[in-house]
A protein has these predicted regions:
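Conserved Class I SAM-dependent methyltransferase catalytic core
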Residues: 3, 7, 128-185
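Conserved SAM-binding strand-loop segment of SAM-dependent methyltransferases
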Residues: 70-81
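Conserved class I S-adenosyl-L-methionine
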Residues: 23-31
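Conserved SAM-binding motif I beta-strand of class I
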Residues: 47-52
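SAM/dcSAM-binding transferase cores
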Residues: 184-230
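Conserved SAM-binding loop
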Residues: 61-62
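Mobile active-site "lid"/loop adjacent to the S-adenosyl-L-methionine
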Residues: 105-134
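Conserved SAM-binding loop of SAM-dependent methyltransferases across substrates and taxa
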Residues: 32-45
Length: 230
């Protein structure tokens, strides 16, 4: 389990959904490094580049790496993910050779969601289909052949996610995350393979809490113990 600054559930779920046979990871929109570092903690043979646009968060990501004794396997890069997929985009270590990309794109683009009053937080929670497509292009540019992209997003964004993945990815697996068994999903975990054309598959959902509000064993295994999702 990774400790440190602001380790959130989304990042831990994302890291748990990544396959353990990956060795060269890029964590896009790393924030304070939670997803990339959680993956490194679970897969000791792996290395990761953590990419974050906000310099203050990038500093916290580096601090978290050191706090968890992962700084020897993690490199923090300050860059705008949306520019990485462009031909003249900035260079990122491992770009074109990574076998795993973790992506936590900004949420809440439309008027159904309130904008955060804090400008930095608002930037991290505002997105639209075009931005999501740019993130997928960035992942495509980072990955080598048959590399795996894992991302987490809102269920409402599923159509945009599938559209963005259609041009370069296949073997798409979708895992819904439910707060309780009788509640609609609040997150989707999506895994896709670069260059594959296998049809999508909907996986059995993950339920975070039982009827009494206590964490399910499956959720505890991931969020408390740093375990893997199927």
């Amino acid at each position: 389990m990774v400790s440190g600054h602001r380790v959130g559930h989304d990042a831990l779920l994302l890291a748990a959904f990544a396959p353990a046979d990956r060795r060269t990871a890029v964590d896009l929109g790393t924030g304070v490094g939670s997803a990339g570092l959680a993956f490194l903690a679970r897969v000791p043979e792996a290395r990761a580049t953590l990419v974050e646009i906000d310099p203050s968060l990038a500093v916290l990501a580096a601090e978290n790496a050191a706090l968890n004794s992962l700084d020897g396997r993690a490199q923090v890069v300050t860059a705008d993910v949306a520019t990485l997929g462009r031909p003249a985009g900035p260079d990122v270590p491992g770009k074109g050779a990574a076998d795993l990309v973790l992506a936590n794109p900004p949420f809440n683009a439309d008027t159904r969601h309130r904008t955060s009053p804090d400008e930095a937080r608002a930037r991290a929670h505002m997105a639209d289909a075009d931005l999501l497509a740019e993130w997928v292009r960035a992942a495509d540019r980072c990955l080598g052949a048959k590399g795996v992209l894992c991302l987490i997003h809102r269920p409402e964004a599923l159509a945009d996610i599938l559209a963005a993945l259609a041009k370069g990815f296949g073997a798409i697996e979708i895992l819904p995350v439910h707060p309780r068994a009788d509640r609609p999903a609040v997150r989707l975990l999506v895994r896709a393979v670069k260059g594959r054309r296998t049809p999508p598959a909907l996986l059995p959902g993950l339920v975070l809490a039982g009827a009494d509000g206590s964490p399910t064993p499956e959720a505890e295994a991931v969020l408390r113990d740093g375990g893997a999702l199927r």
